[in-house]
Amino acid sequence: MNDELFSVRACEIEDAQSIELLEREAVDEGQQYRGVQQILGEAPLIGADLSNVLSSGNQFVLIVDHQSQTQGFAHVVIDGEVATVRRIFIATQARNLGAGAKLLTAVRTEAKRRGCKQIDAIALPGDRLTKNLFERANMKARLLVASSDL
């Protein structure tokens, strides 16, 4: 991995359009996985509401760029001492090049700076790319919720 290939920065309101485009790509990609509608209900898209998200004291959004082009983002919500990555998405062309790892490292740094002691993350069942990203960052699954209609 070339550590200088990508840079991470705090999201700004001017990033709303880029976030919305990446979110659409994430939703399209996620349609193949179980639970996508539930996760969208629990972790709604943020692009259209970015100003409120950024002004909230318990959330932050980081952007990963390559040559000033947005390649991905992470949306994190803080509850007490726990930072939860509600959504992380890396554009297809930036995958397996270190963008996700660099973004997660920055998420950890920011979460620690904000007083968090633990980091959690959400991934859909079958989403091996996201699961593998988390595992490479030494984040292991600790809970699996199974369900059935009655």
Task: Locate each region found by the language model.
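Conserved GNAT acetyl-CoA-binding A-motif
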Residues: 111-123
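Conserved beta-strand-loop-alpha-helix junction that forms the acyl-donor binding cleft
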Residues: 95, 121-130, 147-150
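A short helix-loop-beta-strand connector motif used in the catalytic cores of GNAT acetyltransferases and
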Residues: 48-62, 84
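Conserved GNAT-fold acetyl-CoA-binding loop/helix
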Residues: 24-49
